[in-house]
Design a protein with these regions (language model features):
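Conserved Rossmann-fold cofactor-binding substructure of NAD(P)-dependent oxidoreductases
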Residues: 25-48, 55-65
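Conserved Rossmann-fold NAD(P)-dependent oxidoreductase catalytic core, especially the SDR/UDP-sugar
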Residues: 61-114, 122-123, 129
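SDR active-site strand-loop-helix element
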Residues: 14, 52, 77-79, 131-133
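N-terminal Rossmann-fold cofactor-binding loop
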Residues: 13-18, 31-32
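N-terminal Rossmann NAD(P)H-binding glycine-rich loop of SDR-like oxidoreductase domains
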Residues: 1-9
Length: 319
């Protein structure tokens, strides 16, 4: 929405929230799960539809069908999670996906996203773009991954930093994703695109250094080998957000082929900017970032971290 407003586009939203504070936005209040509410689209036309739906594909099916003759282009914000696991290192848009159905009422996240893709493709054909986003970071993140690292650094003290420091990361700042979507929608990019930075745009070291610096620099990083973390039964990704060790089965999550999106104009800002702006947002909401209700809070318990660091130092002294 903000990306469209910055371009002086006429923006319309459709959701259950109704009125909002920004009078530049036309707000249609309705529930897409109720087909009767889609009658609000009657007699209207739009150049571009952007859809972030992650629920039952039938809602994407009904919305896309209702808009097929009323919108020029349809961009669906999908996910690289639709690829059949485990994700391949260097995998491009031709990699096999999970099964999905446009008529599904429920299912796992990946299959729901894939079913929604299928529904939109059926309604819009060559006028549809599936933006399969990688890991999304930046202000307003509701998965809690980057906010957890920022809040951990803000707490200070010794921080367990999962190595190696030069581990390549792949992600996309939500604002860069939004900008690319609007650019792509107006330049006739269609089909499927993996949308993220190139692998190595940032490293784990650069990310954590930036987190430490923007929060005041009172924490110290102790880099711990991946093998030790595994032996300590500390879970990557969930307990140590964003991080996956080099030999992890799902390492491809940080190594997808994203050349099609970059050829179509994707530009990714420096990790330091993403981290700073996310911290500014976290501070602005009293350091209490919201978390999606369907997700478990990420992060490592302080007692587990302290014990793991003590054991790590002891092992190094005796080796």
């Amino acid at each position: 929405m903000e990306a469209g407003l910055r371009r002086s586009w006429a923006v319309t939203t459709f959701n259950r929230h109704g009125a909002g504070a920004d009078d530049r936005v036309e707000r249609l209040s309705g529930d897409r799960l109720h087909v009767r509410d889609l009658a609000l689209f009657n007699g209207r036309e739009w150049d571009v539809v952007v859809d972030t739906w992650a629920g039952a594909p039938r809602a994407a099916r009904d919305s896309a069908t209702a808009l097929a003759d009323r919108a020029g282009r349809y961009v669906y914000v999908s996910s690289c999670s639709v690829y059949a696991p485990p994700p391949l290192v260097g995998g491009d848009e031709s990699v096999a996906t999970v099964e999905g159905s446009p008529d599904a009422q429920a299912g796992e996240y990946a299959s729901l996203k894939r079913g929604s893709e299928m529904a939109i493709e059926a309604a819009f054909g060559g006028r549809a773009l599936m933006a399969r986003a990688g890991l999304i970071l930046g202000p307003h993140e509701d998965a809690g991954r980057l906010p957890w690292w920022l809040l951990r650094m803000d707490r200070g003290g010794e921080v367990l930093a999962p190595g190696p420091a030069d581990l390549a990361l792949q992600y996309v700042d939500a604002r860069d994703l939004a900008r690319w979507i609007l650019d792509a929608a107006t330049s006739d990019v269609s089909g499927v695109c993996n949308v993220a930075s190139r692998s190595g745009h940032a490293t784990m070291g650069a990310l954590l250094d930036a987190c430490r610096d923007v929060t005041g620099g009172t924490s110290s990083l102790t880099w711990v080998d991946p093998g030790y973390i595994e032996r300590a039964r500390i879970e990557p990704w969930s307990q140590l957000p964003i991080w996956l060790p080099p030999n992890h089965e799902f390492r491809g999550m940080h190594a997808a082929n994203v050349e099609r999106a970059h050829a179509a104009g994707l530009r990714c800002r420096p990790v330091e900017e993403t981290v700073k702006d996310t911290w500014d947002w976290v501070v602005s909401i009293d350091k209490d970032p919201p978390l999606r209700p369907d997700l478990d809070p990420p992060g490592l318990d302080a007692a587990i971290e302290s014990a793991a660091l003590a054991a790590w130092h002891a092992a190094r002294r005796t080796s």
